[in-house]
From Swiss-Prot:
Disordered, as annotated region: 592-633
Organism for this UniProt entry: Lawsonia intracellularis (strain PHE/MN1-00)
Protein name: Chaperone protein DnaK
Composition bias, Polar residues: 597-619
PROSITE patterns: HSP70_1, HSP70_2, HSP70_3
């Protein structure tokens, strides 16, 4: 059985992913691009697709088809198609069945045919990448697509020689790729504003289940409309300056379209841009040049109502889901238009929180489609059932540190244990906080379970021995137990869903861990030096108390002052200062030990033969063993 590829058949650009092992991989086109323009062009000798078609659009606008997704499954007399006819440089006609079609050189092409040409290109790129034939695919569609549009998409796949195993909604695909790596049972909103369509879906994710609660959208709202507003503005400004209407000149319009798209992208990061198109047209007086500055503020003014149109579907989707904005845990941005600052601002204002920008808005849908393909092929299952544990497992220890017991990618079944102790005197119980993840701090990882081991007999801190054991069987089921080695008392818990993560989510956590490596290292270092300092203070104070009356008063005063100095510096965040104060206290503590041993030796020397003392010392040192050994190689 061959690979099932995942395809995001977009209005402006398309993308294809495939599962390689347990990881989704982007299939680049021959030009190295991770996305391919959804453009088809017909020339006198050839048919061009993707970048090649887009490059020649200016000189061949009437035979260059873009945004054909807007025509999929639509009637020629529908308001959307009528509106698009006014702006498209290519000819849109009614087919014999009343559906919208395009006419090139007297021949009709259905939107399905044009889409199939794009799909064929993606299929060929995938075959070149994989080195094997590809016949099966998962193709995404806007969640708000109707049945006719879905069927048209499936037909396009069939025309391209693909067995479409599943038509999957774009927000659902995005959810699969995004994953749910922070909390179980999250409610998320996927805000998907692409080149031609807008979707918003409210989903509940967790326990390896993605459930769509409600969806809404506008299948004729996207980046193409934003571009058109800029084109209209440039046409008007040029007409004011030169008295020439560029809207009747297809070649000029195509140049304006390219410039409008680039300007829109630039204004996502810059505050203003310059559109410079020399020789845009000519009249009797000679050639004319277009030079217009466009600011971000002006762009936002031009498209404010378009952005506003995204809010009502969000309200409706929430209402249908029976939720308030406060119930949404994460807002995921999908689609290239979500890079626009105004869009991000409106999303944040509506949902009351900053959107999550952890996914690549251009690729996340195709990635999710590939994961769905892996599920259908049986290559992707609940990660708990796989033969390795995908993320490290461990518990929270003193100072909020995540202590790993089983590292990620450990082959299962496996069992690992480690002995811990109490952090306070007479501690009657310990709380076991079971975690999964790769970050050094417990709070940054995923909680799997919490349970308590009670009934620990009163004892000084550091004395009780608590063995914590993780046991993962071949089914991926995790058992965690905690046992007091002194009393034999044991408590255990079975975790049947230790991971609801896809491989993409695991990779995301690892990348996140790497990006936060420096910050995590500092946090961990300060915790470790504090713990070391705290332990030294405890043991030193205990020694002073136990040896009361036997220590030189001057030395005791020196040690006490150093203890207070260390406690004071521990209130800050300077690990170097804490280390220095700890070393100073340790040095003073060594003097305490030297004095103690000196007193002991003097006492022993006064009471008997030194050789007897030595022999006695050897006998009493049960834990000191002198032994011969042979190294076995």
């Amino acid at each position: 059985m061959g690979k099932i590829i995942g395809i995001d058949l977009g209005t402006t650009n398309s993308c294809v992913y495939v599962m390689e092992g347990k990881e989704p991989k982007c299939i680049t086109n021959p030009n190295g691009g991770r996305t391919t323009p959804s453009v088809v062009a017909f020339t006198d000798k050839d048919r061009l697709v993707g970048d090649a078609a887009k490059r020649q659009a200016i000189t061949n606008s009437a035979r260059t088809i873009f945004a054909v997704k807007r025509l999929m499954g639509r009637r020629a007399d529908s308001p959307e198609v009528v509106h698009w006819k006014e702006h498209a440089p290519y000819k849109i006609v009614a087919a014999s069945n009343g559906d919208a079609a395009v006419e090139i050189d007297g021949r009709e092409y259905s939107p399905q045919e044009i889409s199939a040409i794009i799909l064929s290109k993606l299929k060929a790129d995938a075959e070149a990448y994989l080195g094997e034939s590809v016949s099966e695919a998962v193709i995404t569609v806007p969640a708000y697509f109707n049945d006719a549009q879905r069927q048209a998409t499936k037909d396009a796949g069939r025309i391209a020689g693909l067995d479409v195993k599943r038509i999957i909604n774009e927000p659902t695909a995005a959810s699969l790729a995004y994953g749910f790596d922070k909390k179980a049972n999250e409610k998320i909103a996927v805000f998907d504003l692409g080149g031609g369509t807008f979707d918003v879906s409210i989903l509940e994710v967790g326990d390896s289940v993605v459930e769509v609660l409600a969806t809404n959208g506008d299948t004729f709202l996207g980046g193409e409309d934003f571009d058109q507003r800029i084109i209209n503005y440039l046409v008007e400004e040029f007409k004011k300056e030169q008295g020439i209407d560029l809207s009747k000149d297809n070649m000029a319009l195509q140049r304006l379209k390219d410039s409008a798209e680039n300007a829109k992208k630039e204004l996502s990061t810059a505050m203003e841009t310059e559109i410079n198109l020399p020789f845009i047209t000519a009249d009797q007086s000679g050639p004319k040049h277009l030079l217009i500055k466009l600011t971000r503020a002006k762009l936002e003014q031009l498209v404010m109502d378009l952005v506003g149109r995204t809010i009502e579907p969000c309200s409706k989707a929430l209402e249908d889901a029976g939720l308030q904005t406060s119930n949404i845990d994460e807002v995921i941005l999908v689609g290239g238009m979500t890079r626009m600052p105004l869009v991000q601002k409106k999303v944040a204002e509506f949902f009351g929180k900053e959107p999550n920008r952890s996914v690549n808005p251009d690729e996340v849908v195709a990635m999710g489609a590939a994961i769905q393909g892996g599920i259908l092929a049986g290559d992707v299952k609940d990660v708990l059932l796989l033969d390795v544990t995908p993320l490290s497992l461990g518990i929270e220890t003193m100072g909020g540190v995540f202590t790993k017991l089983i590292d990620r990618n450990t082959t299962i079944p496996t069992r690992k244990s480690q002995t811990f102790t109490t952090a306070a005197d007479n501690q009657p119980s310990v709380s076991i906080h079971v975690l999964q993840g790769e970050r050094p701090m417990a709070s940054d990882n995923m909680t799997l379970a919490r349970f308590d081991l009670t009934g620990i007999p009163p004892a000084p801190r550091g004395v009780p021995q608590i063995e914590v054991a993780f046991n993962i069987d071949a089914n991926g089921i995790v058992n965690v137990s905690a046992k007091d080695l002194g009393t034999g008392k044991e408590q255990s818990i079975q975790i049947t869903a230790s991971s609801g993560l896809s491989e993409a989510d695991i990779e995301k956590l690892i990348r996140e861990a790497e990006s936060h490596a420096s910050e995590d290292k500092k946090k961990q270092e300060i915790i470790e030096v504090r713990n070391h300092a705290d332990g030294l203070i405890y043991s030193t104070e205990k020694s002073i108390k136990d040896l009361e009356g036997k220590i030189d008063a001057e030395l005791q005063a020196d040690i006490t002052s150093k203890i207070e100095a260390l406690k004071k510096v521990m209130e800050g965040e300077d690990s170097a200062a804490i280390k220095k104060a700890t070393d100073e206290l340790a040095s003073a503590s060594h003097k305490l030990a030297e004095q103690l041993y000196k007193q002991t030796q003097e006492t022993s020397g006064a009471s008997g033969d030194p050789t007897d003392t030595s022999a006695s010392s050897s006998k009493s040192g049960d834990d000191v063993v002198d032994a011969d050994f042979t190294e076995v190689k």
